[in-house]
Amino acid sequence: MTEPRFGPAGNSESFAAAGFKKSEDAPAWLAQMGLTAFEYQCGRGVRCGEETALKIGAAAKQHGIRMSIHAPYFINLSSEESERMEKNVGYVLETARLAVPLGAVRMVVHCGGQGKLTRERAMRNSHENVRNILRALDENHLTGCTVCLETMGKK
């Protein structure tokens, strides 16, 4: 049986208060506290370079920290706009590319809100768009991460 892992999503205020500024220092800091997981946040866009991601990934491996990554928050899988969905697929692909040097095994993707759509229509769109994303990940050979859908906290 796999042991549960605990850790933060992103760097907390206590990380900065301890004098740290770089995410590559997070794995050692987390390990010192007995934590075993770290979710790299791309909530406002994928803004981490490959060199930095490699450093974070190497530090995570060295300290036994399991990595995950969070795709940008502005993704909305219930969208009916084809241009918007093309962008959403692009955001997920960017996130998946960054997951590789980070060594992330899971990629969290927000489903977004239903807006003025009925719940049924929003779910149908989301299912279709998730299939499109999975197809794009497969076509781009970016299948090393499990896609984890995260819902909003309403009804």
Regions found by a protein language model. Give the residues of each.
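N-terminal pre-domain/capping segments
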Residues: M1-A71, I75-A96
